[in-house]
Amino acid sequence: MKKIILTGDRPTGRLHVGHYVGSLQERVRLQNSGDFDEIYIMIADAQALTDNAEHPEKVRQNILQVALDYLACGLDPAKSTLFIQSMIPELTELTFYYMNLVTVSRVQRNPTVKAEIQQRHFEASIPVGFFCYPISQAADITAFHATTVPVGEDQMPMLEQCREIVHKFNAVYGETLTDPQIFLPSNKACLRLPGIDGKAKMSKSLGNCIYLADSPEEIRQKVMSMFTDPTHLRREDPGHTKDNPVFIYLDAFSKPEHFAAFLPEYSGLDELKAHYERGGLGDVTVKKFLNSVMQEELRPIRERREMWAGRLPEVYELLRVGSEKARAKAAQTLAEVRYAMRIDYFEDGNLLK
């Protein structure tokens, strides 16, 4: 069996460092590992419209922004197929068939769906398209016979629901769909970065993000304004590093060479944490170090992004070619599904015999 990856992002805004440590850098590593036969990276515009139906221009404009972020982070169209979800109509047909295999109560029990309904204040009036997006995700994954789905920990219930659909379909119609496995980030600190305001989630809608496209000055301002330990009021006060956003970011981004270059008086992060926890280390010193680390890590990404931004026709062509390739793969899967369901009427030469 081929080893195939399917993953992607909703184009509701530029991607931020939470996306980078939570999924993008892992995708690039997997892409360059040579361990996978096919890799599909989807810009999920159709899914984005489930809660942005009245703002299609927002989705349209951000398709290009997400594509630029992908290329800037190192996703290579020669190794990974980058495509736009809505350009693959087969996904919609697969979603329709899978709806017959899932109950309303099962979707309602999905923890991710419940959390996102609450976050978007949809409790009183849930758009049907949004409510059904776990089924749409199952179509996305199975259309490419994905064996591996790199996602954040919060998406585990979605993949479990996808696997239930796969098992039900195969039990009813015969072995047709591939059972996918979740792939979590290898660095536990990178499962989810908090926002710079200390809130649990970095979110475009909350305005608490550091974007991959941010300028050096924007990065500096955001880092220096970050929430820290509220009990660490004075330099000499003992501080807490656990649940402290500045140290969570250092867990995710700092490397030994950063200490050698920017903070040589410390041997590494453990020594820095120990000093902060016993007192005598101010937040400004730690934030300045984090700023140096972030500038170093994000500089090459920003430079590649600026390079691709000057070649927009080429970016669109990459997306067009990728979408054509992805559609051919999805069409093949849809034919297999229709055959299994016995609704391939005009393809079945034995129908009238």
Residue ranges with predicted function:
Residues 1-3, 346-347:
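Extreme N-terminus of proteins, especially the signal/transit-peptide cleavage junction
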Residues 111-115, 119-169, 173, 194-197:
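Internal, conserved structured core segments that host functional sites
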Residues 2-139, 257, 296-298, 305-306:
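N-terminal Rossmann-like or analogous alpha/beta NTP/dinucleotide-binding catalytic cores
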Residues 157, 163-353:
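Conserved nucleotide- and phosphate/pyrophosphate-binding catalytic cores
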